[in-house]
Amino acid sequence: MEPENYLAWLARDIVRNLSYTSLVYNNPKVAIVELLDNKEAFFAYEKEQKTPEALINYIDSIVKSSISVEDKIEALLKIRYISVYVDDKSDKRDIVLQLLNRTIKKIELKTKISDELNDAINAITIESKNWKIQNSKSFKPYHYNQLVSDFIKYNEFEVLEGTDPLKWKSDTLQGLSPNYNHRTHTLISSIIYATSVRFDNYNDEQLQVLLYLFSVIRTNYVNGYLEILPNRKWSHSLADLRENKSIMMYSAKIIHASCAMISILHAVPIDYFFLAQIIASFSEIPAHAAKHLSSPMTLYIGIAQLRSNIVVSTKIAAESVATESPNISRLEESQIREWEQEMSEYPFQSSRMVRMMKKNIFDVSVDMFYAIFNCFSATFHVGHRIDNPQDAIEAQVKVEYTSDVDKEMYDQYYFLLKRMLTDQLAEYAEEMYFKYNSDVTAESLAAMANSSNGYSRSVTFLDREIKTTKKMLHLDDDLSKNLNFTNIGDQIKKGIPMGTRNVPARQTRGIFILSWQVAAIQHTIAEFLYKKAKKGGFGATFAEAYVAKAATLTYGILAEATSKADQLILYTDVSQWDASQHNTEPYRSAWINAIKEARTKYKINYNQEPVVLGMNVLDKMIEIQEALLNSNLIVESQGSKRQPLRIKYHGVASGEKTTKIGNSFANVALITTVFNNLTNTMPSIRVNHMRVDGDDNVVTMYTANRIDEVQENIKEKYKRMNAKVKALASYTGLEMAKRFIICGKIFERGAISIFTAERPYGTDLSVQSTTGSLIYSAAVNAYRGFGDNYLNFMTDVLVPPSASVKITGRLRSLLSPVTLYSTGPLSFEITPYGLGGRMRLFSLSKENMELYKILTSSLAISVQPDEIKKYSSTPQFKARVDRMISSVQIAMKSEAKIITSILRDKEEQKTLGVPNVATTKNRQQIEKARKTLSLPKETLPKVTKYYPEEIFHLILRNSTFTIPKLNTMTKVYMNNSANITKLQQQLGVRVSSGIQVHRPVNTLLKLVEKHSPIKISPSDLVLYSKKYDLTNLNGKKQFLIDLGISGNELRFYLNSKLLFHDLLLSKYDKLYESPGFGATQLNALPLDLTAAEKVFSIKLNLPNTYYELLMLILLYEYVNFVMFTGDTFRAVCIPESQTINAKLVKTVMTMIDNIQLDTVMFSDNIY
C-alpha cells in the first residue's frame, strides 16, 4: 500500500489544473486557502497571492523535499482550494486563437503533411463530393455545409425572429449546435493543453494528423461559428448572420468532431490517418459521413476469420469459457463473392479502414481486428445527426402497404402472436387479483415518470397558474377537478404529438408522446411481461432474460457458435420495423382478440379484473389498440414557420410501455412463421437457438444448404409478408444489440460521443456533475476499446476547465482534486480511473484521513426546495396520493402505515420534475456550496463516521502479504484496460450465474416486497425502524403490522428472531450493489465472497454477517486500489494472540457500525 502513488497523483492534478489556468487567463494571481487543525474542527484561511508559476514551484518543492511521504501528502491535503484572481478580462477567444497559432507553428517545426496523408485526405474528399452529387435528390438544405447567410436567404421559413435580437428561434440551426458543457473555445484550449504536455511522446504519423486537425480547427475558428451561449442566447443576431459571408453551417460541429479525433489519436491500436479521413469526409457530407464510413463493418464481421479459441457454453444464458484449442475457420465462396461485390460498389474506396479490412480476411490477429474495430468506433464520434423533426418523421413512417401478400403466412403469424399474448394476459389478470386484490392504481402511478403529456395546459401550482406539459400535473389536475379522463380512445384520435431522438450516424427518429392514461394502463401489463422475460420465462429467446446479473457472458451461446463455425448464424434486419405491414392490423387485432380470449380462460370474473383509477385495464387496453391502429400524428416544428403536419399512421407507436416487449413477441411470431414455411422447401434446416430484442433478431441453425440459398429464400419469405429485410448470414461472426461477436470473442464499440450530446445540458446541473458523467462515458470507451492512454488524455481535457467554480466576475475557486473526485453538487462523483463514487485515500496516517474527510464531505450539500413541502399540502397533490393510498390499503388488506408514508415521500420527490423546482434545488445546492467556499475564514467540524478505506488500511496493517498468482486466460469478453485484465486474472471471470454466493437473504424485505404494490428500498426499512422502540415485543409487532405483515407470517417472523439481522442487512444493502462499477467490462468480475477470499484470508472471530460485510468492503476497496495503482497482492490476517484478535474484532465491528458509504449517481446491481 504505497502512499507514493497517491502523492504523485495529487501533486500532478493540482499542478495540471494550475498550469491550465495560467494558459487561458492573462496574468492571473492565485492564493492558497489552507486548513489549520484546531482540535475539534478545522479552520480555513487564505494565504498571500502569487503567480501560478510560483505556486507550481512551491508544490514542486514540497514533493521534492526530504520530509516523509505522509507529511508531503498532508501539506497538499491542507490546500482546501486555490483562489484565482483575474484582473485582465480580455477576450478568451483571442487567447485561444494565439494558442492555436503557436501550437500549429510548433508542430510545423517538427513535421509536415506527407504525400501519403495528403493523398488519403484528397481521395476521400473527392469521393465524398461525388457521393453528394449523386445523392443530392435525398438531401435537405441543412445537409449541406453552406454559408448560414445563404441558408437563411433561401429558407426564410426555418427561422423565427424574437423580441430580443439574440433570442431568435430555429429548430434546424439549433440542431447544428454540438451541445457540450463548455463553450467551444474552452474545449479547444483544453485540447491544446492536453496535447502540449504530451508533445514529445508523439510519433511522426500522429504529429501529421495533429497538424491537419489543428489546421481544420483554426480555419473554422477564424471564419467564425454559431453557438448558443450559457444564458440561452445566440452568439449572433439574424441581422448579423444575413450579412456574414464567412460563417458556415457546420463550423462548430467540425471543430468538435476534430477535437474528438485528436482524443482518439491516443487510442491504441488505431490507424492515425483514417481519423483525418473521417474529418475530411465529414466536412463534405456532415449528415451522412458517419453512417457510410461505418457501414462496411456489418459485412466484415461476418467474413473476417480471427485467430482465437473455441468457446464452450451451456444452455444457461450466462455460462461460457474459452478453451485451449484453436477456433475453426469457415468461409464459403458465396460469402467472399458477396463481400467483393459490395466492396466494388462501395463509394468510399480510399477509406483506410476498408483497405485494412480487404487485407485482413483470413487468419486475422486480435490486435489487427482491434485496430479495425477502433477505427469503426471512431466514425461515431463526429457527433449526433439532427434533422428537422417534420422531415425525419415523414420519411420514417412512409411505407407502401399492399393486399398482395401471402394470406396463409399472415394467418400463421397472427394466430401465433395471439396465442402467445392470450396465455400471458390470462396469467397476468389472475396474478393481479391474487397479489393486489385487482387494484393496481398504486403500482401504476408510482412508476409513472414525470415526462411530457404531449400538449400544454394551464394548471394550478401552489399560488399560481402555470402552463405545463408534465404528466404528473395533468394527472393531479384531472383528479382534483374530477374531470372525465377515461375516454382514452377519443383522446388518441385527436392526434398524437411527436417528440424526437437523435443518435450519431442515424436519421432522427420520432417518439410518440401518449397521454398519462396510456402509461398508467399499460404499466402493469408491461411490467408483468418484462419480469417474466427476465426470469427466463420464454426460454432464452428474449434478450430481457439477459439482465445485468449476467450481462457479461449472455452472449455465450453465440460466442460458442461463432468459435466452432458448425452452425449458420442468420441475423435479419427489417427496415422501418415500426411501420411495417405486419405491425399494423395483424399486430393490433392480435392484442385485442388475445384479451377477449384470455377472458374465457381464467378463473376470475369481470369484476375481479385489474383496475387503475376505476378503469378496467383490459377494456382500456382494447380501446388503446383500436385507436392506435388508425392514428394521426401531429408533428410540429415550433422553431420555424412550418405549419404543423398531420400524418396518417398505422404502425407500432414507440412510446407505449408495451412497445419493446410487444415487438419482441411479434418478432418471435414473425421468425417462427418464416422458418415454418422455409422448412417445406429446405427440410435440412434445424433451428438451434433464437434470440430477439425488440426488432433485432438472431437465429442459429444447422443446415446442409448453401449459405446464399438460405439467404435468398429467407428474403423471399419476408417479401411475401411485405417486409423489406437485409438477411445477413455467416458462420463466424454477427452483430446483435450493438455488440459484435466474432470467432468466440465479444467486442463492444466505444461509440459514446463525448464532445457532442443529443440535447443541450440543463442549466440546473453544475458543470462538475455533467463533467462527471462525461468522464464516466470516456472511461467506458476506454475500457471497451480505446485503452488507458485515451482515458488519461480525456481526463486532461475534461477536468481542468471544470475544476474551478465562478464566485464573482473576477474571482474563481480552483477546487482541490480531492473535493472534485468525491460526491456532492460540485463534484464529479467519479474516480479518475472511471469507477463511480469517491476517489479513495491511499495513505496510512490518521491526520491525513481527517483532512481528507473534511475535503470530501464539506461540499456534499443537499437542499430540499420549499415548493416540495408546500405542494404536498395542496388539494391537487392530495387527490393523487389519497387514491394511491387507498389502492395500497386495498391491495395489502391492511392500513400499512409505513408503506403509505414511504409512498407519500416518494410522490413528494416527483414534484422535482415540475419545471423550475429541480432547477431551484440544484441552484440552491450550488449556491450553498459556493457560499461555503467564499468565506475566507470558516470553521469545519470533523467527520466522526468511518470511511471504508479506513477498514482496508486497518486490516492491511495487521496482515502479511504475498504476490498473487495471476492466471493467464483467454478473454471471451474483450476489454482494453491493463488493470481490469489484472483483476480478471486474479479474481477470475464471472462464468455462470448459478454458483455465486448469493447476497444473504433479507427475509423482512422479501415479505414486504411480496405484498407491497410499490417498490420499497432497504434504506426505507432502516429509516422507519428508528421511529419504533424495537427493544420490546410490542414495538417489534407494531413495526411489522405497519409494514403490512399480518396473520401467520407475522407470528412466524417474530418467532424467527430475524428482525435485527435483516435490519443490519438493509443498512449495508449498498455493499451488494457494485458501487458504480457500471462499465460492463467490470461486471465481468465476480465481485462476491469467493472473489474476496482469493485476495484476503482473514481469521477473526467475527459474527457471520459482519464477516461477509467486511469481505465485501475489502473487495471493493481492493478493486479501487488495483484500478488506481496497477499493483496486486494477497493479504493474510491471522492475529498472534486472543487479545489482539478480540481488540481487532471490536474495532472492525465499531467501524462497520459507523461506516459512511458513498451515495453514488452511477451504480449497477450485481446480484
Curated annotation (Swiss-Prot):
Domain RdRp catalytic positions: 553-735
Enzyme Commission (EC) number: 2.7.7.48
A GO-annotated cellular component: virion component
Annotated catalysed reactions: RNA(n) + a ribonucleoside 5'-triphosphate = RNA(n+1) + diphosphate
Domain of life the protein comes from: Viruses
Pfam families for the chain: RdRP_4 (PF02123)
Localization in the cell: Virion
Keywords for the protein's UniProt record, in alphabetical order: Nucleotide-binding, Nucleotidyltransferase, RNA-binding, RNA-directed RNA polymerase, Transferase, Viral RNA replication, Virion
GO biological process per UniProt: DNA-templated transcription; viral genome replication
Gene3D superfamilies, sorted: 1.10.357.80, 3.30.70.2480
InterPro entries assigned to the protein according to its UniProt record, in alphabetical order: DNA/RNA_pol_sf, RNA-dir_pol_luteovirus, RNA-dir_pol_reovirus
Keyword Nucleotidyltransferase: yes
Stored PROSITE patterns: RDRP_DSRNA_REO (PS50523)
GO molecular function, one term: nucleotide binding
Function, as annotated: RNA-directed RNA polymerase that is involved in both transcription and genome replication. Together with VP3 capping enzyme, forms an enzyme complex positioned near the channels situated at each of the five-fold vertices of the core. Following infection, the outermost layer of the virus is lost, leaving a double-layered particle (DLP) made up of the core and VP6 shell. VP1 then catalyzes the transcription of fully conservative plus-strand genomic RNAs that are extruded through the DLP's channels into the cytoplasm where they function as mRNAs for translation of viral proteins.
Self-association and partners: Interacts with VP3 (Potential). Interacts with VP2 (Potential). Interacts with NSP5; this interaction is probably necessary for the formation of functional virus factories.
Family recorded in the similarity comment: Belongs to the reoviridae RNA-directed RNA polymerase family.
Protein name per its UniProtKB record: RNA-directed RNA polymerase
Lineage start: Viruses, Riboviria, Orthornavirae, Duplornaviricota, Resentoviricetes
